[in-house]
Amino acid sequence: MRAARELLKELEYEVLSGSVDINVNDLVYNTAKITKECLFVCIKGMAFDSHEAAAKAAGAGAVVIVAERPVEVPEGITVVLVKDTRYALALISAAYFHYPARRLKVIGITGTKGKTTTAFMIRSILEHAGISTGLIGTIETIIGDRHIPADNTTPESYAIQEDFAQ
């Protein structure tokens, strides 16, 4: 269990209802993956805005809802208002996984062409130097000897922090 207040400590937020002095068992941003006593982050996507499903999330077990605007939820549910829930998800995810990037050396690669090739070249150089590596890319995530096919070309911040934690 994690204290909601601890997960939110890097954020500017307003408590609309309830209290952040509550423990949560999980961090969820997908309405299909709600668990009992979780903190649920509402995300507005291209086709679906989970702010509209906040009451459903609460009914399925969420005890804390993080949203960009006021949402309708049953009494007793904590609602936390933030400016940007995607940004909030990134910071909450880092806290949830105990800030794994702080224990790693991270190399980011940007540009129009050649990012994947560059990433694999850097990985190869580091591995040959005896340095353990991980790689998060558009094709796959590599953690040690495990190769995990990528679901999206850009993973959600939660998935990145989860990978960093491994």
Task: Report the location of each language-model feature.
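N-terminal leader/targeting and accessory segments in enzymes
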Residues: 1-91
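Phosphate-binding loop of NTP-binding sites
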Residues: 11, 89-166
